[in-house]
Design a protein with these regions (language model features):
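C-terminal domain-boundary segment and adjacent tail
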Residues: 73-76, 182-189, 249-333
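Active-site beta->alpha N-cap acidic-glycine motif
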Residues: 36-104, 242-245, 250-252, 260, ...
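Sec-dependent signal peptide recognition
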Residues: 1-9
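Active-site-adjacent pocket scaffolds in enzyme catalytic domains
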Residues: 117, 154-261
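C-terminal motif of bacterial Sec signal peptides marking the signal peptidase cleavage site
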Residues: 16-17
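Metal-dependent polysaccharide deacetylase catalytic core of the NodB/CE4 family, i.e.
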Residues: 77-169, 189-193, 242-249, 274, ...
Length: 507
């Protein structure tokens, strides 16, 4: 009996021990799976474009961003409010500290300084030279940033495109302002977060959201909310950062956009502003309740991570400061193997071009290739490089001379050279990139060759070009713009700045 009891007790202990081990292993597997899921789930930013500065205070538009912000604060959620400078100044002039303080508990960014007032950003930049446009944007949008910081107590971490207000000069100006660009027309496959014009860009507004005209009516809102079960997985799959456009606060109440006042280039003064038709005030209670339901729904999903663009700037805003011999050689081989201006995951084509030129220039003087170099970030060329070179072949000495001239031009101008000339003809930036790649690989392995063929090469990177150009051209269709707005120069400038394009990596 004693032996039987002992055996039973031992068996029980063994079973308990095995069960505990099994439970511990299952728990570890669950935690690993949860961690892996968290690693792959996309970041989603709840966005609000706070715009209407034309409607009178009596229309109640100012109250809507307040209750949107308060609702999120109550729920422990957050988002990014992009505020037009003129709207912020309007709230300040009306004494609406309550609205300002409610939004200031969240991320506040710029939605351009003057919004739909003509000339818009695009109209201002329509025919502006690159550097001229950058300086204009630094003045105009820098002043808007200053006002937003003074009013909300936080410096904008990003500026979000307002309607069709775009220009690569604006994006480049933001690089000098230390801010990101949101709702950008620029992206790469699988990457909504990219570097373009030396600025962190976040593409698009997502393929969902836009509940503006549905919040006030359950019959409209309910099917849109239910559709998110399929739309969110489909619209976020394989992406890094996605904008969920919550609403234009004023459009929650108004039936038409407030800036119909400015359509087709019209520029009325305050005495001529018309108030858009409004939904009944009592419908705003339904709108507020449905907005809460939307936030609850988004919070309940375990396949996305709600965040802000300010947090995303921190997450994606770091990039390598140096490049070493092995990495540069790897990119040079890709350029030659693929026969195109390649976009590396860590280094833009402009950064690669600058590094190759600097390395060869150093070799020409010192006889050695630097083991590691500081990463320089020039802008793309100011004019389209020729695809066909005017020179069929150069000597090794000429290749090193061209590299030295390119290196000096970048240092002085801050741009890649469009082309460099020899006595018999000129060589475009793409062909120079290929030439420098081959010469660099040779000097890394021993010495420069006696001569090099100069090959035709694309004038800029072409990855995702068609999609980017289409989005830029579509900016002309914004109803606020003049009907004769010409996007030709801005499209071309965007193509040339694709030399600065690369994925942004979470670090």
């Amino acid at each position: 009996m004693k032996l039987t009891t002992t055996l039973l007790l031992s068996s029980s202990i063994l079973l308990v021990h095995c069960s505990a081990d099994k439970a511990e292993k299952v728990d570890k597997v669950d935690k690993v799976e949860e961690a892996a899921k968290a690693e792959t789930r996309p970041y989603v930013v709840l966005c609000f474009d706070v715009e209407d500065y034309t409607s009178p205070e009596s229309a109640g538009m100012d109250d809507i961003p307040k209750w949107l912000a308060e609702t999120m604060s109550e729920m422990g959620a957050t988002g990014s409010f992009f505020v037009i400078g003129e709207k912020a100044r309007s709230l300040e002039a009306r004494g609406r500290r309550d609205v300002i303080e409610a939004m200031a508990r969240h991320d506040v960014g710029s939605h351009t300084n003057f919004g739909s007032i003509h000339p818009t950003v695009t109209e201002t930049l329509e025919h502006a030279a690159f550097d001229e446009g950058v300086e204009t944007m630094l003045d105009n949008e820098g002043a808007g940033f200053d006002d937003l910081e003074r009013i909300f107590g936080q410096r904008p971490a990003a500026l979000a495109r307002h309607g069709g207000s775009y220009g690569p000069q604006l994006v480049a100006a933001l690089s000098k302002m230390g801010a990101a660009y949101v709702y950008s027309p620029v992206s790469l496959p699988g990457h909504n977060a990219v570097w373009f014009a030396n600025t962190l860009n976040f593409h698009g507004e997502g393929d969902f959201g836009f509940f503006d005209d549905a919040y006030h009516d359950d019959a409209l809102f309910d099917p849109m909310l239910a559709a998110l079960d399929e739309k969110i997985p489909a619209g976020t799959r394989g992406l890094d950062v996605v904008a969920f456009f919550a609403n234009h606060p004023s459009k929650v109440r108004s039936i038409e956009f407030w800036d119909f006042n400015y359509y087709k280039g019209a520029n009325p003064g305050p005495d001529e502003w018309k108030t858009p038709e409004l939904r009944p005030l009592e419908s705003m209670e339904t709108a507020r309740r449905n907005f809460r339901r939307l936030v609850e729904y988004l919070q309940s999903r375990d396949d996305i991570e709600l965040t802000t663009y300010r947090a995303m700037v921190e997450r994606f805003g770091r990039q390598p400061d140096t490049i070493d011999t092995a990495r540069l050689a790897e990119i040079a081989r890709r350029i030659l193997d693929e026969g195109e201006v390649v976009i590396d995951p860590d280094y833009s084509p402009a950064e690669t071009f600058a590094a190759l030129a600097a390395a060869l220039a150093a070799y020409a003087v010192e006889g050695l290739v630097p083991g590691e170099m500081e990463c320089r970030r020039p802008f793309g060329p100011l004019q389209r490089p020729p695809r066909e070179p005017g020179v069929a072949e150069v000597t090794g000495a000429e290749a090193l001379e061209l590299a030295g001239r390119a290196d000096a031009a970048i240092a002085v101008d801050g741009h890649l050279p469009r082309a460099l000339s020899l006595e018999v003809g000129e060589i475009g930036a793409g062909s120079l990139l290929a030439l420098f790649s081959q010469a660099y690989l040779d000097v890394v392995e021993g010495s420069v060759a006696d001569s090099y063929a100069v090959v035709p090469f694309d004038p800029h990177p072409t990855e995702n070009e068609a999609a980017i150009v289409e989005e830029v051209r579509n900016c002309q269709e914004w109803p606020v713009h003049r009907e004769d707005l010409d996007m030709t120069d801005l499209v071309e400038m965007t193509r040339l700045q694709m030399w600065t394009l690369k994925p942004a990596v979470a670090r």
